[in-house]
């Protein structure tokens, strides 16, 4: 993430309606047109002197100088007609996304002025509609109309404009009460207070006070090699079902009927629900006929797990874990995935289990290892009979448990998985196999066992990384030798910038790192971006030991291990 540069930053503010621009008529608030005219009267949101001097159009405003060398100029585009956010549907959100697409090259960022009641839904939907964002899209609004004496609208709009104009945050965000949230992590938590929104399972991306604090490690990186893609084909036939104690199976059966194609089911605690056989049977029957069910906790914080038997039963019924997604994000994601053409049911389920736009935090291997859960879960799996329920449960849980066993170097558990007849090439949401994990951790005995079982030695995860590359980065010499002996090799993509990496290692006198790359088959004479090789860098730095090592390895190039 970087600061926006240039003397002028041009933004498009899309005014869709909402409380921020409403006026009182007959004792009730109604949508108010002409927001740009109202904003022109507010000095904190418009510098009239600058606008006159530069002959800006009536619908184009400019903020007072936020810094001595930069101005934020914004055009207000008012929707025709304005919408009450309670009436917003996918159709209106598609219109917003397409408006952003039409003006994408003209502006450095976008602010969407939206009603608060469905703003979290809108932010979630837009995050999935807008793929490969390279510019900020920030939603904001108000609890009190902007022309009222005591209104939060002025600060919210100003904050959204400043964040969109001063920082390159390539995400759909929501700005409210001095906090910038990832849009698909938000939910509305208060009907009246100005602090109306929260992000229960992810800290704010930025907090505004006397200073602006950016949580840079949380901001997603832009995909500069790809162009903006707007997904307007969203599936409208999705629903939200909240379980409650004693919910009748007949009610659930009625809800799950066609034309419904997907449902977000809010469950108790960490993903639990009633285990009554008739209810589980209705859920299983719906899943078997192709209805996709995503399990989200109705708790504000926390995530869906399978630590308890009721949660296990839900997984066994064919229900997909939503982990820590909000219901708003899960509903939007379901609509997006079901709207993608040409995908099989299995492909759609795999997409739902992946983190696509930063909407959920997937469990790490360490999470699976915590509290001795690995052994308990493996024992539970081994004790299950060969019923359809058991097979479904194993399909859900085995990938994560196999990776956890590889992480822990647990040969016994991995052998138990083999005895279950399971393929150890199975992958998690990020494309990692047990071999990736074992290679990264340096567990040579686990790597040897996996190779003996015939796993794919060159399997790549979603980042294009092979087990060999992970072993090189970890300087695990014994693992590198095992992988090379099994025929592993670094791909052209993995070797693309190897010259720069080798020069970096040489400058730091990192002999082990250089030896690892050589052991993996890399050419130590590869130049970096300016034509220097590792040996030249080591000589220039006066690293005699590194020079001697590199010369020795070059002399032994003919003896370098070759793939079989």
Swiss-Prot record:
Span list, region Asparaginase: 41-350
Top-level taxonomic group: Eukaryota
ANK repeat residue intervals: 141-170, 396-426, 430-459, 463-492, 530-559
Tissue/organ expression: Expressed at high levels in liver and kidney and at a low level in stomach. Barely detectable in lung, heart, spleen and brain.
Entry keyword set: Acyltransferase, ANK repeat, Hydrolase, Lipid degradation, Lipid metabolism, Phosphoprotein, Repeat, Transferase
Means of activity regulation: Inhibited by phosphatidic acid.
Modified residues (Phosphoserine): 478
UniProt-annotated binding residues for substrate: 84-86, 116-117
Asparaginase/glutaminase domain sequence ranges: 9-355
Catalytic activity: a 1-acyl-sn-glycero-3-phosphocholine + H2O = sn-glycerol 3-phosphocholine + a fatty acid + H(+); L-asparagine + H2O = L-aspartate + NH4(+); a 1-O-alkyl-2-acetyl-sn-glycero-3-phosphocholine + H2O = a 1-O-alkyl-sn-glycero-3-phosphocholine + acetate + H(+); 1-hexadecanoyl-sn-glycero-3-phosphocholine + H2O = sn-glycerol 3-phosphocholine + hexadecanoate + H(+)
EC id: 3.1.1.5, 3.5.1.1, 3.1.1.47
Molecular function GO labels: 1-alkyl-2-acetylglycerophosphocholine esterase activity; acyltransferase activity, transferring groups other than amino-acyl groups; asparaginase activity; lysophospholipase activity
pH-activity dependence text: Optimum pH is 6.
Disulfide bonds: none
Active site (catalytic residues): 19
GO biological process: asparagine metabolic process; lipid catabolic process; phospholipid metabolic process
Protein family: In the N-terminal section; belongs to the asparaginase 1 family.
NCBIfam families attached to this UniProt entry: asnASE_I
Oligomeric and partner information: Monomer.
Function summary: Exhibits lysophospholipase, transacylase, PAF acetylhydrolase and asparaginase activities. Can catalyze three types of transacylation reactions: (1) acyl transfer from 1-acyl-sn-glycero-3-phosphocholine (1-acyl-GPC) to the sn-1(3) positions of glycerol and 2-acylglycerol (sn-1 to -1(3) transfer), (2) acyl transfer from 1-acyl-GPC to the sn-2 positions of 1-acyl-GPC, 1-acyl-sn-glycero-3-phosphoethanolamine (1-acyl-GPE), and other lysophospholipids (sn-1 to -2 transfer) and (3) acyl transfer from 2-acyl-GPC to the sn-1 position of 2-acyl-GPC and 2-acyl-GPE (sn-2 to -1 transfer).
Protein name (Swiss-Prot/TrEMBL): 60 kDa lysophospholipase
């Amino acid at each position: 993430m970087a600061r926006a540069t240039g003397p002028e930053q041009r933004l498009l503010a899309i005014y869709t309606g909402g409380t921020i621009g409403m006026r009182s008529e007959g004792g009730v608030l109604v949508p108010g047109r002409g927001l740009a005219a109202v904003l022109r009267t507010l000095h904190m949101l418009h510098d009239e002197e600058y606008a006159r001097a530069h002959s800006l159009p009536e619908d184009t405003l400019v903020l007072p100088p936020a810094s001595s060398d930069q101005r934020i100029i914004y055009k207000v585009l008012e929707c025709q007609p304005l919408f009450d956010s309670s009436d917003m549907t996918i159709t209106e959100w598609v219109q917003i996304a397409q408006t952003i697409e039409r003006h994408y090259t003209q502006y450095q960022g976008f602010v969407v002025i939206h009603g608060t009641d469905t703003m979290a839904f809108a932010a979630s939907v837009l995050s999935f509609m807008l793929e490969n964002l390279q510019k900020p899209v920030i939603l904001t609004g108000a609890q009190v109309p902007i022309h009222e004496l005591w209104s939060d609208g002025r600060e919210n709009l100003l904050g959204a404009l400043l964040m969109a104009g001063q920082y390159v945050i390539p995400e759909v965000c929501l700005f409210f009460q001095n906090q910038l949230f990832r849009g698909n992590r938000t939910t509305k938590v208060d009907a009246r207070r100005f602090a109306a929104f929260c992000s229960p399972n992810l800290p704010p991306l930025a907090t505004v006070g006397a200073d602006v604090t950016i949580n840079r490690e949380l901001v997603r990186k832009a995909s500069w090699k790809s162009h903006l893609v707007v997904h307007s084909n969203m599936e409208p036939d999705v629903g939200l079902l909240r379980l409650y104690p004693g919910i009748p199976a007949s009610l659930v059966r009625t809800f799950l009927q066609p034309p419904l194609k997907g449902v977000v089911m809010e469950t108790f605690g960490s993903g639990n629900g009633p285990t009554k056989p008739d209810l589980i049977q209705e859920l299983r029957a719906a899943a078997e006929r192709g209805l996709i069910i995503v399990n989200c906790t109705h708790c504000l914080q926390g995530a869906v797990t399978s630590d308890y038997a009721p949660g296990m039963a839900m997984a066994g019924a064919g229900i997909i874990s939503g982990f820590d997604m909000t219901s708003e994000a899960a509903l939007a994601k379901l609509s997006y995935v079901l709207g993608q053409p040409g995908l099989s049911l299995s492909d759609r389920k795999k997409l739902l289990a992946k983190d696509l736009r930063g909407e959920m935090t997937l469990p790490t291997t360490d999470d699976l290892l915590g509290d001795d859960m690995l052994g308990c879960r493996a024992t539970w799996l081994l004790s299950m009979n060969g019923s359809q329920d058991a097979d479904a449960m194993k399909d859900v849980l085995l990938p994560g448990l196999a990776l956890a066993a590889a992480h822990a170097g647990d040969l016994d558990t991995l052998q138990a998985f083999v005895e279950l007849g399971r393929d150890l090439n199975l992958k998690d949401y990020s494309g990692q196999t047990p071999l990736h994990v074992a290679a990264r951790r340096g567990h040579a005995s686990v790597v040897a066992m996996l190779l003996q079982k015939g796993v794919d030695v060159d399997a790549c995860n979603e980042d294009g990384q092979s087990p060999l590359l992970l072993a090189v980065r970890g300087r695990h010499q014994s693992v590198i030798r095992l992988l090379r002996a099994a025929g592993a090799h670094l791909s052209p993509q993995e070797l693309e910038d190897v010259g720069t990496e080798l020069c970096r290692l040489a400058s730091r006198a990192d002999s082990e790192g250089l030896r690892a790359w050589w052991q993996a088959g890399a050419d130590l004479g590869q130049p970096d971006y300016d034509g220097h090789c590792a040996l030249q860098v080591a000589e220039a730095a006066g690293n005699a030991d590194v020079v001697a090592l590199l010369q020795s390895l070059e002399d032994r190039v003919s003896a370098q291990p070759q793939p079989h």
